[in-house]
Regions:
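Extracellular/periplasmic helix-loop-helix junction of adjacent transmembrane segments
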Residues: 117-151
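Helix-breaking motifs and short loop linkers at transmembrane-helix boundaries and internal kinks
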Residues: 128-129, 152, 163-164, 184-189, ...
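Cytosolic juxtamembrane N-terminal segment immediately preceding the first transmembrane helix
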Residues: 1-52, 56-119, 126
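Structural signature of the two symmetry-related core transmembrane helices
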Residues: 166-180, 391-406
Length: 550
């Protein structure tokens, strides 16, 4: 597939009119319609101001600049005019106030989830092990988290039912308390129970990409999702660095390093929960950092895509369960989770089995995730720029598959356990699956037809099916398979190869559907004297202007 860059004409506009921070306009809650006029420099849609004196009509009598965007509900009502600069100012505020804060929260969540791998090689296993030893207890501790994660994935739909500032604050505080309690566990059964509770607390947070769709357009979502998800490799890198620092001080601190690790990484969540209650907006209209006019701009700018989406029907929520796109992206996430969930938990152990010391393994765990963090941001930016997900996803899945193949066949290739080539292969493996997760989540949300119901159900489906992967992933690297862990690496390689096949098939399917919708619309436009009433549009996705993002 050849990807051509989108036109950058609209992005180069510079406004000469109103200050984007100027707070005029009203908070009317009426919904806006939308329509497109040609492919010129200005977009026109439907919006309105209810008060006659709003904006003083100072721009209505002037010839309109190509730097302005008009929206109006019908010819009898005033046009709501705002500039591209004003729209960008609103988006920048969402980026700073919403996306960055959510990324910080996710970093803390992933930190509390994955630090068990570092704690294990910091003598946690020997302190908690039963008598006689049971080598499966560590895997049980990992599995209990993902079992709870799977059973409580339905909580992702609560983003529509509970105010976000309340929901997030409660979740963050709950998993922070449980994360700290891991540091005082006296046995593996206690730790297993705490990991289950941690999984419940973090399961509800999986709806953040869906929450971000309340604020951003489809074409803007991948980069924002990437900023959010990229906190995962950053958290793992930070956790490894912190574990290295704590472990290196093990001779001068009175508490076991692994206990201190849990306490230090859990406490910030408790502290930040109160901040979350105060600053997280439930929607653009409740964002305290927006002026009244900016709230109106935030509402109106999203109406273009809401109007282009396929109309919702009474069974629209359940219709998402029949959508092949939702199911395919769900299976892609499930396969990717085999690698995504296992490597952060087992990499320190794998590096130790390669012959590195415990201290060196903590340090060597960080670089692959730091590189993943940087490349995730670059990939997401390009994905949004070209409005394309599939080709980038396929490329990264291939890279991850290649890395795992090297690790899987390293013993047959005659490589030493501590070979530099084995360590180098970890980099494309990690970079690849982190990018696949980001792109697949954005792909799922982008391609759910209809309104919030369909998107909510489709996203919840992806989360539930996706969490079947980690239940298997926690058993991929038993100690007896070291130092090469051939079977686990082979499973991950096969999983990422399956992602390539599924993603390629999905791109082809959606491309065919898009072309069919275009043909049908051209045929309807060519029929003279036939007018479709609004109620006749049904749920045919393409008729509302909706197209799958490939």
């Amino acid at each position: 597939m050849i990807i051509t860059p989108p036109s950058t004409t609209t992005e180069s506009w510079e406004s000469e009119s109103d200050d984007p921070e100027k707070g005029y306009g009203h908070d009317n809650e009426e919904e806006y319609g939308f329509f497109e006029r040609g492919r010129g420099r200005s977009r026109r849609g439907r919006g309105h101001d209810d008060d006659d004196d709003d904006d003083d009509d100072d721009e209505d009598d002037e010839e309109q600049s190509p730097h302005t965007i008009k929206r109006k509900p019908n010819p009898q009502k005033e046009e709501f005019i705002y500039t591209l600069q004003e729209e960008k100012a609103v988006v920048r505020k969402f980026d700073r106030k919403v996306v960055v804060f959510m990324a910080v929260l996710y970093m803390l969540a992933f930190l509390d989830r994955s630090n068990i791998g570092n704690a294990r090689i910091a003598n946690m296993d020997s302190d908690l092990q039963s008598d006689p030893p049971n080598p499966q207890l560590y895997s049980y501790a990992l599995s209990s988290f993902y079992l709870a994660y799977l059973l409580f994935e339905w909580m992702a739909i609560l983003w529509r039912l509970i105010p976000a500032h309340v929901y997030v604050a409660v979740l963050v505080a709950s998993w922070g308390v449980v994360a700290c309690l891991q540091g005082v566990a006296t046995s593996y059964p206690v730790l297993i129970g705490l990991r289950f509770l941690l999984g419940i607390g973090e399961a509800g947070f999986t709806g953040v990409p869906f929450y971000l769709s309340f604020f951003f357009r489809r074409g803007e979502l991948a980069l924002r999702t990437a900023v959010f998800i990229s906190a995962a490799p950053l958290a793992t890198s930070f956790s490894s660095t912190l574990a290295f620092a704590i472990t290196s001080l093990s001779n001068v601190i009175p508490i076991a390093p692994w206990r201190l690790l849990f306490l230090i990484e859990g406490l910030p969540c408790i502290l930040i929960a109160g901040i979350a209650w105060q600053i997280i907006p439930d929607s653009p209209q409740t964002a305290q950092f927006l002026t009244a006019r900016q709230k109106k701009i935030a509402r109106v700018r999203l109406q273009s895509e809401h109007q282009q989406a396929a109309p919702s029907s009474s069974g629209s929520g359940l219709s998402a369960l029949k959508d092949p796109v939702a199911w395919t992206t769900s299976v892609i996430i499930m396969l990717t989770n085999l690698a995504y969930s296992s490597l952060p938990a087992f990499l320190p152990t794998i590096l130790t089995a390669m012959g590195h010391s415990s201290l060196s393994s903590q340090a060597l765990s960080a670089p692959p995730y730091l590189l993943s963090f940087l490349i995730v941001l670059v990939t997401a930016y390009l994905s949004d720029l070209y409005r394309s997900r599939g080709p980038f996803l396929i490329c990264h899945a291939l890279c991850s598959c290649a890395g795992y193949l090297v690790l899987a066949f390293s013993e047959r290739m005659g490589l030493e356990p501590g070979s530099w080539l084995r360590y180098a292969a970890v980099f494309p493996a990690a970079v690849g699956f982190f990018n696949v997760v980001v792109l697949t989540i954005a792909w799922n949300v982008n391609n759910q037809k209809g309104g919030g119901k369909e998107k909510g159900v489709g996203f919840a489906l992806m989360q539930v099916v996706g969490q079947l992967g980690p239940l298997v992933a926690t058993r991929l690297y038993p100690d007896g398979d070291g130092p090469f862990f051939t079977s686990g690496m082979g499973v991950c390689a096969a999983a990422m190869g399956g992602v390539v096949v599924l993603a390629a098939g999905l791109v082809r399917y959606m491309d065919g559907v898009n072309k069919r919708w275009e043909r049908e619309e051209k045929e309807r436009e060519g029929e003279e004297g036939v007018q479709l009433m609004e109620g006749e549009r049904g749920d045919k996705g393409g008729e509302g202007g909706f197209r799958y993002m490939l």
